[in-house]
């Protein structure tokens, strides 16, 4: 059996073990953790968000997944020294080394020590979220005898709430106090002055603390609501939330990091894809071609069948992009930069990804080597030398976000917008309904819908894609929340629940964008604190005494008067159905495609009676 398959078995076994044991009583301190906690990271000079994401096990390449928890930061690429960034993590119930009965709540993050490092220097990396004394207490290495190559647990304490204090709060921020802070001032910062007595009860003995120590503050989720406390399981300490699956993820992360570290030193060869124009299986080649510093352990593409995808050399990609020059750079995403190139007579877009983005690289490679559709961007090939590279067909007309809000683009006609919506819906319908397994994109937004020279749309950027078995409707709860703020439905942002209806919700937001050309989050001033979601704005218009007039205030001014208001009203109603809070009430992408076909057709001879499951949606679009 291939190494990758063995690793998968190990992962599944560990997950089953964690899920089965984590909710059992583990001692007097706690018996279970919770899916989600936040840490307030104080920004000092020479720090950036990628560093913070790396310290908390999120991965530097995934730093943009912090955006939903930081609505007051307009751009995570520019953070102010002296400010604070909220970082999410799993709050687990853990035991002190050698004392399984002594338990505590904390996030634990594998930290690779280097020569000369001590617990004090590790604590300094976390900016008072932990201490040298606490690191020594939660690790097995003596402070004066830490091996140079040791991987320790960097532990950050957290809270899951307490039912005896309040059932209204289930999400907490670990906040390290600074000289200017008191418990009362921090509570006021988070709008909890009226609940100061409750905050005090969560932080006994901290009322007079200033300048040092940690306090736990109830905070709102990305949708602006307080998460209620989940009912603790039997044997759980007050306020503990059952989080078996997520705790399993923490265990797996540690296992995975250990495997990476071990194979970095021991790997002798790697399994790589064989270049071929035809469908091929993987072969093995000598490590003379790919060194451990380039690819660690087994090739990350092991086990993937590549259908007509070419393995390019680094030299060929470098030559085609003038050494990945600024002049060839055409974009920058959360997982890497994109460069224009001409390869073997074809225009191409090359995404250059950091080695730490292996998960996203694999996800995208796996989807696009198995799934082929007119409305999905086409993968030409890949490269795994020096960095991770994906080579796509070049779509020369930019993305939908640029056409709606960028400079130098001709306004999109209403007919073009409907066609773009239909093309995008067809791409999503294909991955939801016609692939085995079913794929869930998880990051549908206007920036990930590419427009070709004929103004036809293709869905792109599959780096966050999840998959599920045929007939499955959702992924396990506790999935790490990634994606883009403003496009995430409530069940995903709050609980990590993943199903195809996550994409349906995001697509509904894109429909609102097509109507209004506004961003998913609309800021009425330069201050990001004064903002509203596009979903809210349209619901407000639809609930007004005259919905058509309400909508006119939101319609893209670039359309002028060149639009049928009835068509806009119907598309708005479709978007509203897609963005319903209850995922069960949202239509499938199959029904959305039918509705858009009806809306885009001028024919009176559509036979809608035999099409798909949502006849009411069809009737809505056809005006019946």
UniProtKB/Swiss-Prot annotation:
Domain LysM intervals: 173-218
Domain of life of the native organism: Eukaryota
GO molecular function: ATP binding; chitin binding; protein serine kinase activity; protein serine/threonine kinase activity; transmembrane receptor protein kinase activity
Organs and tissues of expression: Expressed in seedlings, roots, shoots and stems, and, to a lower extent, in flowers.
Keyword Iron-sulfur: no
Subunit structure: Homooligomer. Interacts with CEBIP. Interacts with LYP4 and LYP6. Interacts with RLCK176.
Protein name in the entry: Chitin elicitor receptor kinase 1
Organism, scientific name: Oryza sativa subsp. japonica
């Amino acid at each position: 059996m291939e190494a990758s398959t063995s690793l998968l078995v190990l992962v599944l076994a560990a997950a089953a073990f964690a899920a089965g044991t984590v909710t059992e009583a583990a001692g007097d301190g706690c018996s279970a953790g919770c899916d989600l906690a936040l840490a307030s990271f104080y920004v000092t000079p020479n720090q950036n968000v990628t560093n913070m994401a790396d310290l908390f096990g999120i991965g530097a390449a995934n730093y943009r997944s912090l955006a939903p928890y930081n609505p007051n930061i307009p751009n995570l690429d520019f953070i102010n020294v002296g400010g604070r960034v909220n970082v999410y993590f799993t709050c687990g119930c853990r035991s002190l080394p050698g004392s399984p009965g002594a338990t505590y709540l904390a996030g634990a993050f594998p930290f690779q020590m280097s020569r000369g490092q001590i617990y004090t220097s590790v604590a300094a990396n976390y900016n008072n979220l932990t201490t040298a004394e606490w690191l020594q207490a939660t690790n097995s290495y003596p402070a004066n005898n830490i091996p140079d190559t040791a991987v320790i647990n960097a532990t950050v304490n957290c809270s899951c709430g307490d039912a005896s204090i309040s059932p209204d709060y289930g999400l907490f921020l670990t906040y390290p106090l600074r000289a200017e802070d008191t418990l009362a001032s921090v509570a006021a910062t988070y709008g909890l002055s009226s609940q100061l007595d409750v905050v005090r009860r969560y932080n006994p003995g901290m009322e007079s603390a200033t300048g040092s120590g940690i306090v736990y503050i109830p905070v709102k989720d990305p949708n602006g609501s307080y998460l209620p406390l989940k009912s603790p399981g039997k044997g759980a300490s007050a306020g503990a939330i059952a989080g078996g699956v997520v705790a399993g993820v923490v265990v797996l992360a540690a296992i995975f990091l250990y495997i990476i570290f071990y194979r970095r030193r021991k790997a002798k060869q790697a399994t790589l894809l064989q270049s071929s124009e035809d469908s091929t299986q993987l072969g093995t080649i000598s490590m003379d071609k790919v060194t451990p510093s380039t690819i660690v352990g087994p090739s990350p593409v092991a086990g993937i069948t590549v259908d007509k995808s070419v393995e390019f050399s680094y030299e060929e990609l470098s030559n085609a992009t003038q050494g990945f020059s600024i002049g060839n750079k055409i974009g920058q995403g959360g997982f890497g930069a994109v460069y224009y190139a001409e390869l073997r007579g074809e225009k191409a877009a090359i995404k250059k990804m950091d080695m730490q983005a292996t998960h996203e690289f694999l996800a995208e490679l796996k989807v696009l080597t198995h799934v082929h559709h007119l409305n999905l961007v086409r993968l030409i090939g890949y490269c795994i030398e020096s960095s991770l590279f994906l080579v796509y067909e070049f779509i020369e007309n930019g993305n939908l976000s640029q056409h709606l809000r960028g400079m130098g683009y001709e306004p999109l006609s209403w007919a073009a917008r409907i066609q773009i919506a239909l093309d995008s819906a067809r791409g999503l319908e294909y991955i939801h309904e016609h692939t085995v397994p079913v794929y869930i994109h998880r990051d549908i937004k206007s920036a990930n819908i590419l427009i070709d020279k004929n103004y036809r749309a293709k869905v792109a950027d599959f780096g966050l894609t999840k998959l599920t078995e045929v007939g499955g409707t959702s992924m396990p709860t506790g999935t790490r929340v990634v994606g883009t703020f403003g496009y995430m439905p409530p069940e995903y942002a709050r609980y990590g629940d993943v199903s195809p209806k996550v994409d349906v919700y995001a697509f509904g937001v894109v429909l609102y964008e097509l109507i209004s050309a506004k961003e998913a989050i609309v800021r009425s001033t330069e201050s990001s604190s004064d903002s509203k979601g596009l979903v809210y704005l349209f619901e407000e218009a639809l609930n007004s005494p005259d919905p058509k007039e309400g909508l006119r205030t939101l319609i893209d001014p670039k359309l002028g008067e060149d639009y049928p208001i009835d068509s806009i009203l119907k598309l708005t109603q479709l978007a509203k159905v897609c963005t319903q809070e209850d995922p069960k009430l949202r239509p499938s992408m199959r029904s959305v495609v039918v509705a858009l076909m009806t809306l885009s057709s001028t024919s009176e001879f559509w036979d809608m009676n035999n099409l798909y499951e949502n006849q009411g949606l069809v009737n809505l679009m056809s005006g019946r």
